[in-house]
Design a protein with these regions (language model features):
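Short, well-structured segments within or immediately adjacent to enzyme catalytic domains
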Residues: 15-170
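Amphipathic alpha-helical segments typified by the pilin-like N-terminal helix
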Residues: 1-17
Length: 170
């Protein structure tokens, strides 16, 4: 029991550290790009162009996006994370679909997503406007009037993770 508790605590610390590393990468990207936030596209544009902060779309199926590390290590934030795919995942997340387990998979490559209000959502946010009337889309670092009240990354539940664009429908 003591070892299990220590392991759980270590996984939590590693998960928080990964979120911090992604946050730092996100800030550095903006600093190198005239304060513009990294793109944060939805499913269709991610699949079509693969030019967003993370280039994979997670599913419960056997699609290559679930395991192909290139979709992470070649994405827009990759050079800011030393192309380390591990920072995109909470180490405690071992959830797989029955189909994935039957194929012998040990894990999927990502469990973290980005707030849909942060970055250009591409076709999701035409003209830089939020897809939700009355809500702000943050495109540059200077757009945040109260940055302490905004989350950027979160460890998303395996049942809902797909693209890198996390939204709670207002």
């Amino acid at each position: 029991p003591a070892l299990a508790k220590a392991k759980t605590k270590a996984q939590g610390i590693a998960c928080m550290s990964n979120g911090k590393q992604l946050g730092l990468a996100w800030i550095l990207y903006a600093g190198d790009n005239e304060e513009r936030l990294v793109d944060n596209h939805g499913i269709d544009q991610t699949m079509g162009q693969r030019r967003t902060w993370v280039n994979n779309v997670m599913t419960w199926g056997l699609e290559p996006d679930n395991t192909n590390l290139n979709f992470i290590t070649e994405a827009k934030l990759a050079s800011y994370t030393a192309k380390s795919a591990g920072v995109y995942k909470c180490p405690a997340d071992k959830v797989l679909s029955p189909q994935q387990r039957a194929r012998g998979w040990s894990q999927r490559v990502r469990s973290l997503s980005m707030n849909a209000a942060c970055g250009d959502g591409g076709t999701l946010t035409p003209n830089g406007q939020s897809p939700f009337p009355g809500y702000k889309q943050f495109l540059r670092m200077g757009d945040f009037s109260s940055p302490a009240n905004i989350f950027v990354f979160l460890d998303e539940h395996p049942d809902s993770i797909n693209d890198g664009w996390f939204v709670n429908n207002p």
